[in-house]
Amino acid sequence: MSLETYKFSDELHDDFKVVDSWINNGAKWLEDIQLYYKERSSIEKEYAQKLASLSNKYGEKKSRKSSALSVGDTPAMSAGSLECASLTTWSKILDELTRSSKTHQKLSDDYSLDIAEKLKKLESHIEALRKVYDDLYKKFSSEKETLLNSVKRAKVSYHEACDDLESARQKNDKYREQKTQRNLKLSESDMLDKKNKYLLRMLVYNAHKQKFYNETLPTLLNHMQVLNEYRVSNLNEIWCNSFSIEKSLHDTLSQRTVEIQSEIAKNEPVLDSAMFGRHNSKNWALPADLHFEPSPIWHDTDALVVDGSCKNYLRNLLVHSKNDLGKQKGELVSLDSQLEGLRVDDPNSANQSFESKKASINLEGKELMVKARIEDLEVRINKITSVANNLEEGGRFHDFKHVSFKLPTSCSYCREIIWGLSKRGCVCKNCGFKCHARCELLVPANCKNGEPEVADDDAVDTSVTATDDFDASASSSNAYESYRNTYTDDMDSSSIYQTSLSNVKTEETTPAEPASKVDGVVLYDFTGEHEGVITASEGQEFTLLEPDDGSGWVRVKIDGTDGLIPASYVKLNDELNTSVTLDGDSSYVKALYAYTAQSDMELSIQEGDIIQVTNRNAGNGWSEGILNGVTGQFPANYVTDV
């Protein structure tokens, strides 16, 4: 192999840390050389009697570090008595020092004020550039490990879903009831979604891993080689400069100085790299690809599932991926244009300026990360489109914005509560549809576009401007109504959307009536940190305004201030416990069919409505419940439990 074309990536593979340690040794070695010139400056004042001891001192230092500087701390093959070219040159410099016993103050000043400072600057530059490369490697490795961990989590989640599906199947085989059949269907849909997630994450990881080991890591290793050669090249220049000063001041030593310079000239930067690389080369193979592993109890294949509700997840994922791909390609074009201006100063040249090298390292690091991201997205998009074609055609996709909710809010998809600054959620900017972050990719593409689910002033903090990271809170006067309907996990997002909309309209048109004013007492100190949540002290008495509806919160009035407080932090008196306890039959059902009330005692319902049951057996096959604040009776066989 020619030294002119020698590259670390030809012989080193997954050895970044070994190379980084070697580069660090070289950078720290510059400190030794800097100290050498400072000490020589003082020794020059004492003439020849000090020069011999100085040469011996640094000869010993060189001997102790010879192996680490030549072949690294943990070489694959011992170098024996061999030393790298730089150390050989350094040895000849020390030999010359022994023979040079006379000098004067000017030489001492030149060594102290010129050479030592250049070495200090070179060391700081090398260390700064090494840290940049080290940070890039950590980012790339972290991203790879993150993808691998996501595959492992998806695999565990998929296998658990298979277990749940098998359990649901066994229950259905045993009972053959409508409820068990519905649970079986939901479990199967959940398992298939998690299978797709597992497969896609695995494919993305494999592609990312290939790019990491075949392109990203070799590129970093080659740049580390260039960095070391940059150090050696600049070190050679400093050494030459130091002896040029000595030559100009000591004509009698001119011939010896020329000889040393010729030896330094033989120290080609690539020689150290080649010696290090050849003594650290070892057998290495690319890690094997991951393959789909089906659950032991669920026989399956590695094919993506595009049937039924799985389409929602794949459709949303495809649209998100294509949008992200466009952004990443735009970013890549921008980075290419920035790099074009730096390529005049060749980034692979050992003589490249520090500022240019640092800028090009940062930009090329970003470029590698963007290319890796583009590769990941293209793998995912190609896989989905090859199996399901253009799923996104004809869909009315929500334009979600990620938010945090200060007060409890109901997810319009799964009907569970979204709450807390750490609980991430999404709000559609077009229709106000709210959901968990985890539900975003499961929401059907049926945006109402201009028909908001809730009034914007009540749903989102309007003081927040164009940002994806803001807090949202409900501002309804009846705070706990915003999360009353949270007892359904039905997957029909259209029905969920309509029900949520009807609930909000009821809240806007029907003022909340406070509960009977019955006193209670606060059991523990509580500090309210969010809007609508009050602060209370142990022993304070209060008036109950709204009871706990199952959310874990009550609305109370203390010393003229009303707000929410955890139900577990208060104690109600016996009269209140009796008055606010729900009927034993209280639960929720979903309407299977529409029914129009025939009298004032009956309740009109629509398919998909969620009804709170107050009496399951009202007589003659009828039940009693509450819908949109209205209480009435409805046919018991028109509904099903949720």
Curated annotation (Swiss-Prot):
ZnF locations on chain (Phorbol-ester/DAG-type): 397-447
CDD domains: C1_SpBZZ1-like, SH3_Bzz1_1
GO cellular component entries: actin cortical patch; cell division site; cell tip
Source organism superkingdom: Eukaryota
Gene3D superfamilies: 3.30.60.20, Arfaptin homology (AH) domain/BAR domain, SH3 Domains
Domain SH3: 515-575, 584-642
F-BAR domain sequence ranges: 6-272
A Pfam short name: SH3_9
GO MF term list: cytoskeletal protein-membrane anchor activity; diacylglycerol binding; zinc ion binding
Statement: the UniProt record of this protein carries the keyword Zinc: yes
Residues forming coiled coils: 113-190
Any one GO BP annotation for this protein: Arp2/3 complex-mediated actin nucleation
Subcellular localization, as worded in the UniProt entry: Cell tip; Cytoplasm, Cytoskeleton, Actin patch
Keywords, comma-separated and alphabetical: Coiled coil, Cytoplasm, Cytoskeleton, Endocytosis, Metal-binding, Repeat, SH3 domain, Zinc, Zinc-finger
Recorded family membership: Belongs to the BZZ1 family.
Function: Plays a role in endocytosis and trafficking to the vacuole. Functions with type I myosins to restore polarity of the actin cytoskeleton after NaCl stress.
PANTHER family recorded: FCH AND DOUBLE SH3 DOMAINS PROTEIN, PROTEIN NERVOUS WRECK
Protein name stated in the entry: Protein BZZ1
Species, as recorded: Schizosaccharomyces pombe (strain 972 / ATCC 24843) (Fission yeast)
